[in-house]
């Protein structure tokens, strides 16, 4: 989770705070999003891991009214039981007075029950997000988090539902937050998948996102596009995203 610091919602919704609102969405994406078969363009994670003995790369660009972010999240599963993700993103703003900001993500994920066709699975992930531009120096403030993804398969995998619940410790604000996400993927054809989800925490209004994923080379290379926004928020909280995902069968 996701792809993707969490700020006080009152500050996030305050006009003239583009960096805070933007980075809140970035972190939420990083928190909920770690690659798997559901993966891009989902923020809500699933109960799957990257292919055993291999790595994958997800990269995407997200466009807001006054900023653009670019992300790259490589993930590897060398043993088949533990997946590691190490990546980051950069945000650039239309306002020339605002410098670009960067985030870095480190996460580990495992499964307690793998997801089977017409069955269910669940697991756990733990990680941290760092914000060097906001918290400079050798002792960077960041966020430590844990979440539990649950996935359920229906109709021979034509429909798969995902549910996430988690906890976040905001080091910079010394605050705890409960996180959540719910999403669905509908496999319209063997190449085309429709996705929809909602996600957020216990202190702010929810976000939603919907879009499509298309496998140019099934099980190897896909592209996707989404539109999303925060419920009840202004157009500044609306985004469009385009992404790619590369999933080779074996690297080790």
Please describe what each predicted stretch is:
Residues 21-33:
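Bacterial N-terminal signal peptides
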Residues 1-18:
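N-terminal secretory signal peptides that target proteins for export/translocation
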Residues 37-252:
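Transmembrane beta-barrel domains of Gram-negative outer membranes and organellar outer membranes
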Residues 2, 25-28, 89:
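Charged interaction patches that mediate protein-protein contacts
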Residues 7, 33-36:
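Intrinsic disorder/low-complexity segments in short proteins, especially the signal peptide
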């Amino acid at each position: 989770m996701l792809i993707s610091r969490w700020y006080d919602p009152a500050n996030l919704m305050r006009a003239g705070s583009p960096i805070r609102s933007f980075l809140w969405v970035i972190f939420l994406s990083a928190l909920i999003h770690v690659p798997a078969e559901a993966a891009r363009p989902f923020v809500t994670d699933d109960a799957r891991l990257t292919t055993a003995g291999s790595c994958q790369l997800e990269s995407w660009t997200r466009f807001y009214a006054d900023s653009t972010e670019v992300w790259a999240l490589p993930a590897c599963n060398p043993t088949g039981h533990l997946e590691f993700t190490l990546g980051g993103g950069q945000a650039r703003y239309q306002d020339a007075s605002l410098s670009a900001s960067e985030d870095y993500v480190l996460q580990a994920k495992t499964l307690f029950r793998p997801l089977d066709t017409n069955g269910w699975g669940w697991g756990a992930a733990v990680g941290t997000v760092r914000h060097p531009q906001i918290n400079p120096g050798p002792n960077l403030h960041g966020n430590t988090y844990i979440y539990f993804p649950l996935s359920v398969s229906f109709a021979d995998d034509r429909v798969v539902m995902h549910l996430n619940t988690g906890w976040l410790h905001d080091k910079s604000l010394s605050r705890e937050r409960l996180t959540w996400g719910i999403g669905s993927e509908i496999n319209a054809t063997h190449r085309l998948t429709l996705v929809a989800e909602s996600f957020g925490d216990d202190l702010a209004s929810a976000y939603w996102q919907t879009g499509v994923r298309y496998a140019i080379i099934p099980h190897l290379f896909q592209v996707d596009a989404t539109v999303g926004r925060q419920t009840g928020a202004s157009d500044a909280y609306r985004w469009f995203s385009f992404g790619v995902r590369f999933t080779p069968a074996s690297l080790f």
